[in-house]
Amino acid sequence: MKTVRRLLYRDIVSSIGFVALAFLSLFYFIDFVDELDDVGKRGRTIWHAMLGAVFELPGHLYELMPIAMLIGTIYALARMAQSSEFTILRTGGLGPGRALGLLASLGAAFAVVTFVIGDYVAPIGERMAVELKARFAGGLRVGGAGAWLKERRGSGSQEHSFSINLAGTGAGGALEGIRIFEFDNDGRLVSRVTAREGRVAPDGVWTLQDADVTRWPASADAGDAPVHEQRSATLAWPSTLSPAVVAAAVLPLATMTTVELWRYSEHLSDQAQATQMHEIRFWKKALYPLACLVMMALALPFAYMHARAGSVSLKVFGGIMLGISFVLLNNLAGHVGLLRDWTPWVVAATPSLLYLLLSLAAFTWLVRYR
């Protein structure tokens, strides 16, 4: 059985590697062409375009891993079935259960690799790509309204809430366009702080540059409220928001790890903010490596198809269509779940469960009746 395992794994892994390399080459070319639009602007050269495309590769590999596994495994198994190698292995004692177990073990190994790439390598690459673009673009802008953060301090009648708006980040990583609104327990605006830029220290203290502070005394009448204004070149503003939470609000979701997504979702929940999108993203990222097991199970029935059921190229084409349909269903489930407010883990797990049931049903039917 060790020889059988070595034979199967060698062919499957080499096929998966070839498919992954082909996909990565295609996506690298597309990203490189896209980066060429900014060459010549603010000192950006073609080498920066090439480097930016390289930084995107780990993220593409993470997204393409299940599809590459499906296509590569189908190609290897279909080729073995057409050359009667798989038939010889079955005659030698490779039963359906044992074949499924061998592929499941290989799928588990690829699931671990996918998790490592998605949680450690891809976020670093995405952050480096964002930093490279921000350096030549003069900063990173966060949508039209910027990024919003909320914070609560105190308790009971002394509770105050803070709404923080960030326009984006500068080329050096400093926060830009900072606006901080403080409200009392009755929802009245107590103070407003605006600053050109600022940085967040590890202890949560914000160092604001060119800060303007406006205060409205809560005891005064609305029409006669004296406004106190103060301008400071440097202002230290204490906060309970960690640098990780601030970074999560400003940077794209692709730069966040599974743990960071969970922590940010918990922060949003504690501040009574919408968490559905981030919870769905967390569960999709947490369960995505399991798609490798599903793709292995989905590829196995192709080994039990008779050679007359189609050539290897036709079966590979079928695998490509299955992979595309899985990606479409996975993305569609996320958008529909967000619109319909479905349970996040159900939204993330449904596509993989459906394709797993489909693969097991096809595998059982082929083993019994073919």
Residue ranges of predicted features:
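Non-transmembrane, extracytosolic/lumenal segments of membrane-associated proteins
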Residues: W47, G107-G223
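Transmembrane helix boundary and interhelical loop/hinge segments in multi-pass membrane proteins
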Residues: T73-T87, G92
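Transmembrane alpha-helical segments that form the functional core of multipass membrane systems
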Residues: G40, Q273-W365
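Extended, hydrophilic extramembrane loops/domains of integral membrane proteins
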Residues: A244-D270
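Short helix-to-coil transition segments within interhelical loops
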Residues: R90-G95, R340
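Start (N-cap) of specific transmembrane helices in multi-pass transporter permeases
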Residues: L7, D11-S15, R98-A111
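Long, hydrophobic alpha-helical segments
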Residues: L57-L77
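Hydrophobic alpha-helical transmembrane segments
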Residues: M1-G59, F181
